[in-house]
Amino acid sequence: MQEKGLAGKMMDIVPGLLVMVGTLYVLRTYVEPWMKDAVVFGRKGWLVQVLSLNYILLSILTGMFYRNILFGGKIPGWAEEGFRTTRLFIKTGVIMLGSLYTFDKLLKVGGVAITLIVAFVFGTAIFIMWLGSRLGADRSVTATMAAACGVCGVSAAVATAPGVRAKPVDLALSIATILGFGIMTMFVSPFIGKALQLSDYQFGAWVGTGILNSGQVLATCLAFNPVFAPGTAVAYGEIWNVVRVICIPFVVFFITAWYWKGEADAEHTSLGSILASKFPIFVLGFVGMTALSSLHMLGAEGSETLHLMRDVMAWIFGVGLVGLGAYIDVREIKAAGGVPLRIGLIAGMVKYILALIIILAFIPKEGAF
């Protein structure tokens, strides 16, 4: 079969991409405004204000509906290439989020973020190593679960798997477990945050620390407050998220070193090689956008340029989150069972609750910007 050229590959993307963009258009233009005006339990806008059913969560739910009901559990071939752009949309949105910050603002909250994230990332990994040994779990399973729960879910688990000889089934179980837990927290966290009257700063710090998957952190922050601007939940949550993502190569090295200690014939890799191969390149784009903002090259706060960028960000994230929902396979989550499920749920719940306690005890309501 003759390999397709660039034009052919681009055309393959169009059908699935049109589905995602069209879905978001309908949700933002018709469904969300209707829900804001709908009267439930005698209260106008109850669905949005109490359940946080804005276009962000609706995008994910619609994507899940496509995958698990409309498509019968598998994205069809005609739409597959379009839906594969999901990660590109989300990472592009993360890069654009850099426009919400300046370096002086990052320095004001960076110390708190680094302290909390490093403590939780490595603390979670160590806890899972201990829990896995107590429950008699395979070391490869324990290692991938430690990465998945400790850092940011799928990316960290995939990055760790080769160095700890994880089998495909080990990786699949780890990913399914943390995604399943993340889906639950993604929907309940906005409700908890509003019930506890958390500020955007507190909510962003909690979610950025306690939720396991990067995409779910963004979705949860936007469900709590869908506004893209400095001082909002997504602005604070993404600082925590970026710090956590930067930790990936260091955690991969830490976990693989633990694995080697118990496996005499395991393959040794240096920290330098792991840094070179695992460092998340999109973080550099985020930093670059922050540099442009710091130099006032994107315009002053409230400018037309920034207003346009934030509107574009909303669309980029919305399209990406429709795709994110379409990659949540309920059958795979149900298949995650036994010891891996117990490890993931215990560790995830401990991290989630402990993060909330620490945020309530030590993080003030007012952020640095």
UniProtKB/Swiss-Prot annotation:
Membrane topology label: Multi-pass membrane protein
Subcellular location: Cell membrane
Designated name of the protein: UPF0324 membrane protein DVU_0543
Principal place of residence: membrane
Pfam families given in the database record: Cons_hypoth698
Family: Belongs to the UPF0324 family.
Keyword field contains Ribonucleoprotein: no
Keywords: Cell membrane, Membrane, Transmembrane, Transmembrane helix
GO cellular component: plasma membrane
Transmembrane spans: 13-31, 46-65, 110-132, 142-164, 171-193, 240-262, 269-291, 306-328, 341-363
